Amino acid sequence: YSFRPADSSDGLQIYNISDNHEVLSGAANAGRYFGDDLDILILNGDNINDVSSLWQISLIYKLASRITGGERPVIYVRGNHECNGRYAADLPDYLPGKDGNLYYTTTLGGAFFMVLDTNCDMSDENLLITPAANFEELRREQTEWLNAQTYFGGDCTYSILLAHMAVPL
């Protein structure tokens, strides 16, 4: 296999998928729309129902593999469902980010991406989320990190902010 970095010479072909909740087939089929022209895959949260098993984490990689074959860059954004379950607190150990965080910046193909971790849509006291939840602290740390940022892709063709936003029903 061969990896091809994002190439913006003809614009960027980006596929952004969220909320497929462990249903890989439709998301993967849609993700192959660009074929070899795909530049960047964004997995924008809720790609699994929760993080109760390591097998579920593997589904995130399986989805990326079915779309990119390991040959294109993938950006991962945590969704609110990835805040629930036994392994939720360990998710940064298995997925890309920086410094053990799921909020980070990256530049690909002339595009600057800022990835925010909007974490959970429930309070830390809610029994449905992991007992190790401390999202108030995470939000404080992420706010400090955001306030310390000085580069926002000013020399890039595109500047893109990524976040998974849970909408209450």
Segments and roles (model prediction):
Residues 22-26, 49-52, 78-87, 121-124, ...:
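Active-site environment of divalent metal-dependent phosphoester hydrolases
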Residues 26-32, 56-63:
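A short acidic, amphipathic alpha-helical/loop segment
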Residues 1, 58-155:
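Extended active-site neighborhood of metal-dependent phosphoesterases/phosphodiesterases
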Residues 150-169:
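Short acidic, glycine-rich surface-loop motifs adjacent to enzyme active sites
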Residues 15-19, 41-46, 72-80, 160-164:
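Active-site neighborhood of phospho(di)ester-bond hydrolases with catalytic His/Asp-centered motifs
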Residues 1-15, 21:
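Acidic, histidine-bearing metal-coordination/catalytic regions of metal-dependent phosphoesterases
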Residues 40, 111-113, 158-160:
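Structural motif
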Residues 32-51:
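Active-site metal-binding motif and surrounding structural segment of the metallo-beta-lactamase
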